[in-house]
Amino acid sequence: MIKGCKICGISDPKTLTYVVDHPHPPQFVGFIVNWKASSRYVDLVRLKELLSIDKKKSKYVGVIVKNDESTLEKIKDLPFDYYQIYDCSPKEIIKIKEKYNKKIIVALTIENKEDVKKYKEYENVSEIILFDSKGYEKSMSFDHNLLDEVEDHIEKMIAGNIKIEDVTNFKNKHYILDVSGSLESSKGIKDINKIDKFLNTVHNI
């Protein structure tokens, strides 16, 4: 069965409050903290406002692209439970993990089987491996069947243009589903009705 879900790219207090107060809240809520090209990016002032909201049963995740020391220093005292990191070597991940004492979600971008195999380099330096599509937020998909060869003990999170109607396809998979764009009414604007439908669908599977 599905292990849980993450809603990523939340950028306003009203939506965040709705999400954490939902009867079936996501296990993870993600915030884009240094990818300024993203329509979901939140600056430090807004980030502090958002993270002052009680997370209740959810875990807060800071999404970081590359080993951005400046950003890591700015957010080090914020109540993130996890850092989700793209484009860092295992050695860089170890340093970040030790310095900031955060749990780590390593994000790998997937196009083929060789990309998937890279998880072996990170399995000992992260709590969760996120298998995402190429292209940073471009709502691209990849063949999720490529993950069938990933060892069972790996905590797997998957992203890549997952829509609400796709959720049932994963009912026999032990994945954490990571969604963002499919829950929006327009780029960067989350839709409460879509969020509600998604969370209820995941819960009822």
How would you label these PLM feature ranges?
Residues 1-205:
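Conserved N-terminal beta1-alpha1 strand-loop-helix module at the mouth
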